[in-house]
Amino acid sequence: MAKFVLGIDLGTTNCALAYAEIVPEGGESKASAPQILQIPQVVGAGECADRPVLPSFLYIPRDGEFQEEALDLPWTAPVEGKLPWLVGTFARDYGAKVPGRLISSAKSWLSHGVVDRSSGILPTTAPEDLQKISPVQASATYLAHLRDAWNQYSAANGLDAVFEDQEIFLTVPASFDTVARDLTIQAARQIGAKHMTILEEPQAAFYAWLVQSGDQWRKSVSVGDLVLVCDIGGGTSDFTLIQVSEEDGSLKLDRVAVGDHILLGGDNMDLALAHAVSATLKDGMEGLDANQKIALVHGCRAAKEQLFANPGEKKAGITLLGKGSRVIGGSIKTGLDRATLEQVILNGFFPESAPDEMPARGRRLGLTEIGLPYAVDPAITRHLAQFLSRHSSLSKESTMASPTKILFNGGVFEASALRQRIISTLNRWTGQEIPALPAADLNLAVALGAAQYGLAKRGLGVRIRGGVNRSYYIGLETPAPAVPGVLPPIKALCVVPLSMEEGCQTDVPTPDLGLYIGEPAEFRFLASTHRRDDQPGTILERWAADELVELPSLKTTLEAQSPDEVGQAVPIRIVASVTELGTIELSCKSRIDERQWSLEYNVRKSESGQ
């Protein structure tokens, strides 16, 4: 029996772990309040220290690049002649100078359907002598560090509670589809996690607010409220809507909408500021070497935080060390002034846009290097307008969903000016004053909330009902005469509706369907974050380009009983289920005998095309 629930924020920029002890008392259980684990990590060569977060950066050192003991951790078992991979603060800071050996944004790669996320593709700019690793392996490495940190803490405090035996609540962006979730689960299983549950990050932030508010939360929201969780971290922007209703005389919380996966966050802002500041230098960005460019980005981040924290200051200084032997004497002094900050961040990323202004799509070249699908339009307010417009059915007689409360999460919102810009924009769109709920620690809320969710699942707190964050469809081939060069159209059959609860299954009402067996077949899957009314059995013959997103297809051969059946279509019915981990399983049951075939969405095979 697990003694602790562990909440893990596997973030794009930082990871964190929160824990809460479960204390049996009589025939019931009580729990301690969630706390943050201080994580030992290398912060400099030969220097180890505890930090509340583990930066999500992995550096793969060259042989002999450091003395063997320079990267030691409290739990390290040194291998003679081989340096361990470096994770955390020093990996981020040192690796920024050697970007070809540094892995960052592994989490964003998990959601990138164009590449094989289980193969070695990172670092993307690695030198030829470096063996690349997969986004799954990189994520597993961060989780392994958290596992080892917890096990060391458990042993040092006599808790007898190894990581592998505890209940793990692992967070993912609400916008992660079933494939990205499966890959995250796969990474956790690689490091020995046995008892896992997946939770969406904005929901975790809301749970953290519930913990912080205690019994007062019921006075902060009321029946009919629609709470917008606006979560902007270092790498992503994530939007979620939570509805407050009543059931049996008690307030009930339901996650009713999630947004698409948007690669846009604080890192984009720091880079934009660096380009703006470099324009004031004699030779611009081209006059800086690689280390100076990185230092400029870091300097702009610090200057941004200083100016936002001190509204009376007009300018924050930035110093770049010189090149080569002129490190000190050749230093460059520059700075970020408030006018540039507001022009780049407030007007560039948070413009006062109209409610009908949607994100620009931008032109794409026919050929492109394979990389992360960053948002073309940097205006977060326009992405928010698109999200609310897609869920207009949640508010009567309106062209967009109208939140009545807002909860901020993510380090970007440490700047009150950015919170105020979002609030003023929403007020203008909706014609009403929208109060902000007081947030917990913006950088640690997700981990704390994940641990609280673990307690709520045990009956030790209120739960948010959510279910799956998309409706899912399987492609149906349409019988049509063969025409050279023209593929037959497909229809989309809804098999799992939006918000279907974990642990549930449903018979999918269908017309007569046939399942080809005994020979290779391809199954096409699609998903939507905003088709709220589709139910199991709904068939779509056409849809707008942004309504359904096609997922990686599944290619497999389903077993036939005899050679005569090979290539034949067996009449079937479909049963769909959502596992406790939030993944999708489809069972095709024969209408003529007792046979059934499972379409298990095997991530590794679906991505390699086998």
Give each language-model segment a name.
Residues 1-2, 198-230, 389-392, 396-397, ...:
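Conserved phosphate-binding catalytic cores of ATP/NTP-utilizing and phosphoryl-transfer enzymes
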Residues 1-119, 197, 248-253, 269-281, ...:
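Early-domain small/polar-rich strand-loop-helix modules and first-structured segments
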Residues 18-20, 28-31, 41-44, 51, ...:
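Glycine-rich phosphate-binding loop of actin/hexokinase-like ATP-binding domains
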Residues 32-189, 200, 271-316, 324-362, ...:
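Phosphate-binding loop and its immediate beta->loop->alpha context
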Residues 141-160, 208-220, 348-402, 421, ...:
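Phosphate/ATP-binding catalytic cores across multiple sugar-kinase/actin-like superfamilies
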Residues 168-183, 321-326, 333, 372-377, ...:
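Glycine-rich phosphate-binding loops at beta-strand->alpha-helix junctions
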Residues 191-204, 373, 422-449:
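Conserved phosphate-binding/catalytic loops in two-lobed NTP-binding clefts
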Residues 322-394, 461-610:
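Acidic low-complexity intrinsically disordered segments
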